Curated annotation (Swiss-Prot):
Lineage, top ranks: Bacteria, Pseudomonadati, Thermomicrobiota, Thermomicrobia, Thermomicrobiales
Name this polypeptide is given: Large ribosomal subunit protein bL36
Natural source organism: Thermomicrobium roseum (strain ATCC 27502 / DSM 5159 / P-2)
Keywords: Ribonucleoprotein, Ribosomal protein
GO molecular-function term, one example from the UniProt record: structural constituent of ribosome
Gene designation: rpmJ
Record bears the keyword Lipid metabolism: no
């Protein structure tokens, strides 16, 4: 899980999701998991 100021899709399968005010990226590839914070 990467915590970064700006979350970006790193591949076509990445999905940007907003949960409880936190922006997350979920993907099949675990290396692409990100969270904004």
């Amino acid at each position: 899980m990467k915590v970064s100021a700006s979350v970006k899709r790193r591949c076509a399968k990445c999905r940007i999701i907003r949960r409880h005010g936190i922006v997350r990226v979920i993907c099949e590839n675990p290396k692409h998991k990100q969270r904004q914070g």
